[in-house]
Amino acid sequence: MAITVSSRQLFIDGEWRVPILNKRIPNINPSTENIIGDIPAATKEDVDLAVDAAKRAISRKNGRDWSAASGSLRARYLRAIAAKIKEKKDELGKLESIDCGKPLEEALADLDDVVACFEYYAGLAEELDSKQKAPISLPMDTFKSYILKEPIGVVALITPWNYPFLMATWKIAPALAAGCAAILKPSELASVTCLELGEICKEVGLPRGVLNIVTGLGHEAGASLASHPDVDKISFTGSSATGSKIMTTAAQLVKPVSLELGGKSPIVVFEDVDLDKVAEWTVFGCFFTNGQICSATSRLIVHESIAVEFVDKLVKWAENIKISDPLEEGCRLGPIVSEAQYKKVLNCISSAKSEGATILTGGRRPEHLKKGYFVEPTIITDVTTSMQIWREEVFGPVLAVKTFSTEEEAINLANDTHYGLGSAVMSNDLERCERLSKALQAGIVWINCAQPSFIQAPWGGIKRSGFGRELGEWGLENYLSVKQVTRYTSDEPWGWYQPPSKL
């Protein structure tokens, strides 16, 4: 049965609105290269309307509608949204799959996480009520001080195409739990499920303007949103190059930003491991989500004594991965998201080969798939640390391999990068794992696994992988400002100045 993609408009102030310039962008299914629909293309004029709607939502009834309402009221809406998503899970999963090429089983698992994320932040919204007016211990008993946590205000949420609904939720759920009003700008390459969230918000009666969804091109809708003077904070997930531009724009207005950017994460494999078990984790860490993960452990650093045998096993695992239309049962690798990204991935592989690297397996379109932006899982050896394939993010199913002889050498290879998002260490020596968890320069360290993420645990990087943390309590704090309230409690005058003479 054909999957129907609804023709949505922009979601602004609780209503569907045609873009002022009436522009639209075609949706291309990366598995078939066929147009499956289109999305509205917002411009500055539409962004202005969305920001105005968010401002009104914050201030309506002196905030009692949303920003100053109880956390328990906001939690009810978040749970209602979660319930609707759960109800529509199968439909949303298929839409996600044909929109961005994600294997259906992955898309459905993402939606389970979406539901759990809204429910988790509903709980934190309720807890926020009891944490208000937390007292501060002071050295002077003539003063009493406490803390208020208040929503930052209007927030711009700019999200990527590799986890369209899930990464939007990582931002939306905590922002709304905090009492902010948001404008979501998803990637133009994968906006379909994010637009469906607008319909869900209508169905649950979310107050107007609390969540606005503007789709469109980055240089039009995204840039207008990032530079808008009435946006109080920007949260961005995407490339380091775009993140740098957003940071520069925000600096002109001294505006806070949270950035989750690119990565070139290492996976360090020591000689004492179970080779088959670690081979699967290594393949999963790099090729999951079609290799399009910002935290992909795409630099394998393996002990020289096991390198030949281990890489041979990796090749067998990689060549056994089912590559197919993502809607097919058992698909474990779908297409790259777009033609431009597909060409970029192939160019990176070609560049590595021209620089002297060896393509052990993959590096091309699978023979059985004549259409779609498919790339076989690719393993590259004979790599030097100066090669582009070792230093720059590919965002495709490509693993580069180097060997090491000592623990110190492994650490130096792992940390020799501008990025610092994820990292993994594989060893049965837990003391060694502990040493590396401290030595690796990354926001996340996985021990004897790769890529697990949990709503309760912080997610984010260091160096050029950005700053700020999403998920867990840290995700909520992203959207809260801290206000100190201090009261003088003594009946005595302050007594700093000599009082004026009484005539």
UniProtKB/Swiss-Prot annotation:
Keywords: Metal-binding, NAD, Nucleotide-binding, Oxidoreductase, Peroxisome, Sodium. NAD(+) binds at residues 238-245, 294, 393. The active site is at residues 260, 294. It is an enzyme of class 1 (oxidoreductase). Na(+) binds at residues 27-28, 99, 189. One of its GO terms (biological process) is cellular detoxification of aldehyde. Belongs to the aldehyde dehydrogenase family. Dehydrogenase that catalyzes the oxidation of several aminoaldehydes. Metabolizes and detoxifies aldehyde products of polyamine degradation to non-toxic amino acids. Catalyzes the oxidation of 3-aminopropanal to beta-alanine. Catalyzes the oxidation of 4-aminobutanal to 4-aminobutanoate. Catalyzes the oxidation of 4-guanidinobutanal to 4-guanidinobutanoate. This is Aminoaldehyde dehydrogenase 1, peroxisomal. It comes from Pisum sativum (Garden pea).
